[in-house]
UniProtKB/Swiss-Prot annotation:
The gene is saeS. It comes from the Bacteria. Residues 61-114 form the HAMP domain. It holds the Pfam family HATPase_c. The modification Phosphohistidine is found at residue 132. The chain crosses the membrane at residues 9-29, 40-60. SMART domains: HATPase_c, HisKA. GO terms for molecular function: ATP binding; phosphoprotein phosphatase activity; phosphorelay sensor kinase activity. This is Histidine protein kinase SaeS. It is found in: Cell membrane. Member of the two-component regulatory system SaeR/SaeS involved in the regulation of staphylococcal virulence factors in a strain-dependent fashion. Probably functions as a membrane-associated protein kinase that upon sensing the appropriate signal, autophosphorylates and in turn activates the cytosolic response regulator SaeR. SaeR/SaeS activates the expression of exoproteins involved in adhesion and invasion of host cells, including hemolysins (hla, hlb, hlgC), coa, DNase, spa and cell wall-associated proteins (emp, eap, fnbA, fnbB, efb). Coiled coil: none annotated.
Length: 351
């Protein structure tokens, strides 16, 4: 049986009366007190105990009410009612401190729950977007494959065009799966060893796979080193992915025949390097420039399939940058172009 605070106080005070009376009776037997004095002390004890009980009730009732209110508050929170409760208990000190600790805990849990809900919503949108993106290349592959199989596509130039489309859509699927893999591994805590990087050699290895595409689309791509940059230590694998995604984005949102510029500079104290990739594309309005690195955001107002991809490239690049001692900034003008700048901090492997 669990007793309330009020019951425990009443039992304690009432129990003190017979205990005190017994002690006084023993004192009378031992002739420490005479009969009149013993009776007086006994009555005084009873009256004092009653007054003590009354005074305790006066002080304890508000405390019990606060504890009941606090209990209701905790039950509501336990039942999933995470709405903020601004009720404050200013006294006694222990209840005040307990309430403050509970409010702090409730606030942190509420923030975590809101974050979980937000992440779940983002994941749902991400899955829906990826499912949408997968349907288009798959439908195209199925359609052209059936056309080739059934003999509907017979002319040589149509057959060649069909194969080109099949390869393009297969590459698009590969990119989608690659993005999905990177999304899964982004928050696993995977680390990369620092490597000595010669920037010109790194750029050659990154740009080489784009050579045929740039030539086929009649584009101009120029790389400009503003000053001589010595080899430095950085995380090669994330850096390659960041630059690849930014270059993909520049090609995706600029027209065939346009220009891509890559400008590399080192700051005066030689501890950071800026790699700026500029295009002559559609541009991004100022109010959207802060959102382009969100996981579920795409620059297109509608999900325009002509750009391809999953729309995750910038999100992946930004996450990798934040995790690996780098930063991405953006400047853009509508119908003029966009510049994405990666700021790398050289790693000091001796520290």
């Amino acid at each position: 049986m669990v007793l309330s605070i009020r019951s425990q106080i009443i039992i304690g005070v009432v129990s003190s009366i017979p205990l005190t009376s017994t002690i006084l009776a023993i004192a009378y037997i031992l002739m420490w007190f005479n009969g009149h004095m013993t009776l007086t002390l006994t009555l005084t004890t009873i009256i004092t105990s009653c007054l003590t009980l009354l005074i305790c009730s006066i002080f304890i009732n508000p405390l019990i009410q606060k504890i009941k209110q606090f209990n209701i508050k905790t039950k509501q929170f336990a039942n999933g009612n995470y709405a903020s409760n601004d009720k404050t208990f200013n006294s006694p000190k222990e209840i005040y401190e307990l309430n403050q600790s509970f409010n702090k805990m409730a606030s942190e849990i509420t923030q975590q729950m809101n974050q979980i809900k937000s992440e779940q919503q983002e994941k749902t949108e991400l899955i829906q977007n990826l499912a949408h993106d997968l349907k288009t290349p798959l439908a195209s592959i199925i359609s052209y494959s059936e056309g080739l199989r059934d003999g509907i596509i017979t002319k040589d130039h149509e057959i060649k065009e069909s194969y080109d489309i099949l390869i393009k859509q297969a590459n698009r699927l590969s990119t989608l799966f690659d993005d999905m893999t990177h999304i899964i591994t982004l928050n696993t805590g995977k680390t990369y060893p620092p490597e000595l990087i010669q920037l010109d050699q790194l750029l050659v290895s990154i740009l080489q796979p784009y050579e045929q595409r740039i030539k086929h689309e009649n584009r101009t791509l120029e790389v400009n080193f503003c000053n001589e940059i010595d080899a430095f230590y950085q995380y090669r694998t994330p850096l390659e992915r960041i630059l690849t995604n930014l270059l993909d984005n520049a090609l995706k949102f600029s027209n065939v025949g346009s220009r891509i510029d890559i400008n590399i500079s080192e700051n005066e104290d030689q501890d950071t390097i800026d790699i700026a990739i500029s295009d002559e594309g559609i541009g991004i309005i100022p109010e959207l420039q802060e959102r382009i690195f969100e996981r579920t955001f795409r620059v297109e107002n509608s999900r325009n399939t002509k750009t391809g991809g999953s729309g995750l490239g910038l999100y992946i690049a930004n996450e990798l940058a934040q995790q690996n001692n780098a930063k991405i900034s953006v400047s853009s003008d509508i119908d003029v172009g966009t510049t994405m700048t990666v700021t790398l901090h050289k790693l000091d492997i001796t520290s």
